[in-house]
Amino acid sequence: MHKHITYYTSLISEYAFIAYFFTFSFFPFSADIFKLLCLLTVIGCWTARMLSEKKILFIKTSLNIPILSFLLCSLMTSFHSVHIQYSLGTIFHDYLTYFILFFCMVNTIQSLEQIKRIVKAMLITCGLVCAYGVYGYYTGVVIRDERLVATFEYHSRIAKYISLLLPIAVCLFFYYKNIVSRLYLSILIFVCSLSLILTMNRTSWVAILVTIFFIGFAAQKKYLIYILIGMCALGIFILPSKFITQVKTITQVNKFFTSEEILGERLLCWKASIAIMKDHPVLGIGPGKKNFRNVYQQYAEKIRNTEKQPKNEAVEQSQGKKVKRKTKIKGIERLSHPHNVFLHLLVGSGIIGLLAFLWLFTAVFYAAIRSWRLSRSEYEKALLMGITAGLVSIFLHSFTDSFWKKPDAVFLWFIIGILFTVIHNTINCKQVDYR
């Protein structure tokens, strides 16, 4: 009886996870009721299994304590927040969703075959989203600021989504030997790569470049690096001039911190965030977009006025009279985060929040690299390498953007959930073999 309940609850959870990922990919900012139903279904399956076996089923992972520590730090900073109610809402509606998703996956998905089906569904979904994005870009149906956005409203979000999943597709391409699977993955990689180019997101371009180099050396597929270099060289001749101009700005290092031409309002945002951090070093201003948006406006306006003051009045001598010319101060955007994940955590949760966050993701990276190096299964090795590369890619984004918000963090914790499910499955297999 217990075996039947375990089997069916695990199967239902698998379908619910696939539906949840699909819905979040195509409707990242809507369909909240359906997303909630998917999550409740998984929680219900987990609960049903515990009731059936009459015991608490909570798998011990290396993330349990870091996650608890991060939540406690976030709660502590929330009670010191500018808007306590909003900060608590961010923790319960956002942070808890990430961690519930993780624990549900680790505790309900039982086999490697289920993992394979979930990963396959994720990659198919990613391919469909990118195909829709390419269609929307060239038809003008879904486009913003001449960039591909697909279902995500902003180019940076779809770029992070692709950067997280594309390395997995590349690594699995080397695992599968049959022509059909390789053909499917080749099409997927092409569509995702084209979509990434059309986002014109420079951080993603650099992140994927570094990631492919990482995969090439880690998998001992150095020819992959030569292929990438060849494709980049070919792109110079076939891509429109606006893409080449965008690429050139990446190399203009001398202008990164002296001009807003390349980084835009990020420079002002980082200066304001550092100023906020200095005034609230230990506990921050509290988690949540609203807290940052309101406080940022005050600090950014003060900094901009201070910087523009010498330029506001240019005095000219004309017929012995002083003529004043005023330069217009550009409006300040109502940003919801500091465009840097480390500043995001420092401003929101202070030093203690950042330390808890670093502990959490150090544990994630350690588990990913260790399991990948020790894995004996070819599929697991390819998948774990792809996940590790995806994590590297998403953290490279963290220097100019933040992934610690929906929907980015949901996709990230989906991947982390798969990582630890693979690790747990491997441990169970070794225990069975030992017996």
Task: Outline where the language-model segments fall.
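A membrane-periplasm/extracellular boundary helix in multi-pass inner-membrane enzymes
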Residues: 131, 139-140, 194, 216-262, ...
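Alpha-helical transmembrane segments of multi-pass inner-membrane proteins
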Residues: 20-21, 42, 71-78, 100, ...
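TM-adjacent membrane-interface loops and short helices in multi-pass inner/ER membrane proteins
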Residues: 267-336, 342-345, 349-356
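Aromatic-anchored transmembrane helix interface
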Residues: 63-70, 84-107, 117, 123-126, ...
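Membrane-embedded alpha-helical segments of multi-pass membrane proteins
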Residues: 31-51, 91-103, 157-166, 206-213, ...
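Transmembrane signal-anchor hairpin modules in multi-pass inner-membrane enzymes, especially those
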Residues: 1-76, 82-86, 110-120, 172-183, ...
